[in-house]
Amino acid sequence: MDTAELVALLHLASPALPIGAFSYSQGLEAALDAPLIRDADGARDWIASGLADVLAQGELPFLAHQLARWHAHDAAALADANDEFVASRESFELRRETEQMGWSLAQLCASLEWGDAARRATLASIPSVALPSAFAFAAAAHGATPDAALAAYAFGWVENQTAAAIKAVPLGQLAGQKIIVALREPIRDAVRRALATPPEAINTFAPQLGILSARHESQYSRLFRS
C-alpha cells in the first residue's frame, strides 16, 4: 500500500467524514434498553459479535464484490447487487441508515470528483444507493486493494460502534480505546473471512439485530436514529 492509498482510506474511515455515521448505533442502543449490554465488557462482546456475525458474513463480502464490480464497471451487476443488499435490511431504520449514509457518501464523491466521470454517472444512477456500494466506489476510485478497503470499512464501523457505546452505556474514553484495541485482530479475521466468501454465500440473516432495530423504532428514549 502506498502513502496516497493509505491517506485516502484513513479519510474514508474517519469519523469526520460528513455522512452522518455518528447518528446511528445499529441496534446497540436497543440492546442497552433490552438490557443485553450493561458495561464495557458487554459492549465489547456486542460489537465483537456484530463484527463476526453480521459484517464478516454480509456487509464486508458484499463490499468486496462491489469493489470488483466498480473496477470492471459492470453497471447492471452493481445496481442489481445494491438492490439485493437494500432489500436484505430487516427494519425500516436499518434500510434508512444505509440509504442515507450511502447517498451522503455518493454526493461527497460527486462533489470531490472522485473516480472517472463514467463511473460517477453510474453511481448517481443507482437509486437508494447503499453505504457499502458507495464506499466501494470511493475505495476503487483511490485504487485501494480489497483487503485494505475492507479493513478501513470494518475499522470505521468498530470505531463508530465504540463511540455509540461511550455515549449510551456510558463508558469512559479509556474503556472505549480498550474495546478498539481488543478488536484489532477480530477485524483482521473478519476481512480474511469476507475475502474468501463467494457472492452466493453472503449471509445477511441477523434476526436478533432485526428485532432490536424494530423495537428501537418505538423505544421511549433514544439518542440515535438506529
UniProtKB/Swiss-Prot annotation:
Query: Does the record bear Transmembrane in its keywords?
Result: no
- Name a single GO cellular component: cytoplasm
Where does the UniProt annotation locate this protein? Cytoplasm
Q: Could you tell me one molecular function GO term of this UniProt entry?
A: nickel cation binding
InterPro entries xref list = UreF, UreF_sf
Name the predominant localization. cytoplasm
**This protein's UniProt keywords:** Chaperone, Cytoplasm, Nickel insertion
Top-level taxon: Bacteria
Annotated family = Belongs to the UreF family.
Q: Which PANTHER family match?
A: UREASE ACCESSORY PROTEIN F
Assembly description: UreD, UreF and UreG form a complex that acts as a GTP-hydrolysis-dependent molecular chaperone, activating the urease apoprotein by helping to assemble the nickel containing metallocenter of UreC. The UreE protein probably delivers the nickel.
UniProt function note: Required for maturation of urease via the functional incorporation of the urease nickel metallocenter.
Designated name of the protein: Urease accessory protein UreF
- From which organism does this entry originate? Burkholderia mallei (strain ATCC 23344)
Q: What is the lineage of its organism?
A: Bacteria, Pseudomonadati, Pseudomonadota, Betaproteobacteria, Burkholderiales
